[in-house]
């Protein structure tokens, strides 16, 4: 099974857009998706969004949330890095 890891998946909108493109590709519709972020709240939100995206396009990925970056990266075939610039006062 192909494993795609999103580092910084708390960037929900960016994650949603990239995930949608990935899951629309037939070879990835049943892959393992690992969402990793250090922020629990944002990670849970991204997980809900990812599940809704998958359901809406008829994909059936295995979606895993993980705070530990090393675990998230273990065995990954593809890694997508996301981060938000700014946000600090």
Which residue ranges define each predicted feature?
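Metallocofactor- and cofactor-centric catalytic cores in central/energy metabolism, strongly enriched
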Residues: 1-89
């Amino acid at each position: 099974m192909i494993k795609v890891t999103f580092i910084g998946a708390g960037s929900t909108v960016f994650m949603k857009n990239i995930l949608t493109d990935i899951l629309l590709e037939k070879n990835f519709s049943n892959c393992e998706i690992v969402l990793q972020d250090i922020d629990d709240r944002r990670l849970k939100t991204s997980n809900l969004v990812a599940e809704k995206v998958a359901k809406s396009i008829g994909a059936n990925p295995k979606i895993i949330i993980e705070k530990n970056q090393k675990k998230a990266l273990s065995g990954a075939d593809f890694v997508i890095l996301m981060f938000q610039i700014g946000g600090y006062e």
